[in-house]
Amino acid sequence: MGFFGRLFGSKKQEKATPNRRRWSFATRSSHPENDSSSHSSKRRGDEDVLNGDKHAIAVAAATAAVAEAALAAARAAAEVVRLTNGGRNSSVKQISRSNRRWSQEYKAAMKIQSAFRGYLARRALRALKALVKLQALVKGHIVRKQTADMLRRMQTLVRLQARARASRSSHVSDSSHPPTLMIPSSPQSFHARCVSEAEYSKVIAMDHHHNNHRSPMGSSRLLDQWRTEESLWSAPKYNEDDDKILEVDTWKPHFRESPRKRGSLVVPTSVENSPQLRSRTGSSSGGSRRKTPFTPARSEYEYYSGYHPNYMANTESYKAKVRSQSAPRQRLQDLPSESGYKRSIQGQYYYYTPAAERSFDQRSDNGIAGYRGVSDGLDRNQSDKSKMYTSFFSSNPLFFQ
């Protein structure tokens, strides 16, 4: 506007200024030709001046236009620069915002993972503690059970040792008091004498039974003794008038009483007082007598034999083998009404008759008292120990009254 305003303003001024007559106070000359020439020169000078001004104005206007164009270009460049800088800043801001969001999400994921891992670790720790407690409980139960078993075994061992000591002490005390009645030199000779006595027809040996309180070691000991007994004794044949024995053995070791208590033993009045005997005599009244060998009682044999348990004694096969090798148990038949029981020092009840008692009294002067039972069988694999037992039986007492 300024450039065009100045341009049009100058034109208006040029139009507004008419050619006026210049006043001059100089004197007129008398030469008119000189005046006209001077006047034309002046006009030429004015035109030159006007042309110079116009050229200057045009140059100035062009310069101003260039300046305006440069200013506009500068403004445009500044705007471009501003716009460019704004885009970069926005992109940077967007990138920073995205980075912030990613960092926040990453931090949140890390927090969630750490919390979950802590939960899993605490859960695993609780499970491990529970497993350790369970293992401790199981081990404690097993240890307590083993300790209880060991204590029971120790108690059983102590009881057995006490019984063995008591048995040895009673044996020593009995050996210090020798008996008055002696066994004959051989069981066969004594048996021949007893057979001649018809009145002494029945001999019944019954042990005291405590089946509910016997120990496994005692049963194995008695099984071994019974096996040795079968190998020791050989039995001759008997007639119909031969003696028979009713054996009720409980397979439990018992202790012999001391000689001081032998006089105070209780003697039952009759055979019918025994429930074991009553159950066995019911079916023996109408049959004929069988020819059966004489079998010694296990408890009587135990009185002279040692205690030698066998680790195979508690098995069923061993018991069946022993039962198959042993003689069958006899039944009581035709007991006389005057017969009775008498108890020996081993705690057994023996059947006797008055005639047999008189015969024993007659033989007591000669020191004859013995054991009269031998079983009919083979003397299989008789060892040195069995021979020693045979010699021991031939030189030691068996019954005491």
From Swiss-Prot:
Cellular localisation: Nucleus, Nuclear body; Cell membrane
Region (Disordered): 1-48, 165-186, 258-296
Region described as Calmodulin-binding: 105-121
Principal cellular location given in the protein's record: nucleus
Pfam short name (any one): DUF4005
Entry's transmembrane regions: none
Any one GO MF annotation of this record: calmodulin binding
Low complexity bias spans: 165-176, 278-287
Gene Ontology CC terms, in alphabetical order: nuclear body; plasma membrane
Record-linked SUPFAM superfamilies: P-loop containing nucleoside triphosphate hydrolases
Similarity comment text for this entry: Belongs to the IQD family.
Record text on subunit structure and interactions: Binds to multiple calmodulin (CaM) in the presence of Ca(2+) and CaM-like proteins.
UniProt protein name: Protein IQ-DOMAIN 24
Species for this entry: Arabidopsis thaliana (Mouse-ear cress)
Gene from which this protein is expressed: IQD24
